[in-house]
């Protein structure tokens, strides 16, 4: 899955009703690839811009995509990844918790074909 596909997936998971009153500016840096993204939640919508950074983000996260995917999937926690040295958080970690809390979790165990 490419970064674009991953971020588009996150945009789909964002619960627009819960996010309606939120305004978040998050910078995401992938230290293993050097890629940078400006992530924004505003008006119930998640947007991202590649090769960009917010001038005044609420929080900057530095972690590989697989680490972020694991945190968002609930397979690991951000504190565990920071403790292990696989992630770094600068700024308001509460903004990151808010963003993660705005994501819906989809049930992937459903019948595709039923009688």
Language model features: what each stretch is:
Residues 1-47, 93-115:
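Acidic, aliphatic-rich amphipathic alpha-helical segments
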């Amino acid at each position: 899955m490419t970064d674009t596909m991953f971020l588009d997936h996150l945009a789909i998971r964002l619960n627009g009703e819960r996010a309606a009153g939120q305004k978040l500016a998050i910078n995401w840096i992938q230290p293993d690839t050097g890629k940078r993204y400006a992530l924004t939640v505003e008006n119930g919508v998640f947007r991202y811009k590649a090769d960009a950074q917010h001038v005044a983000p609420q929080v900057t996260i530095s972690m590989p995509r697989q680490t972020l995917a694991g945190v968002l999937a609930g397979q690991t926690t951000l504190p565990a990844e920071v403790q292990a040295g696989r992630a770094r958080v600068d700024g308001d970690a509460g903004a990151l918790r808010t963003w993660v809390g705005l994501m819906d979790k989809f049930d992937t165990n459903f019948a595709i074909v039923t009688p």
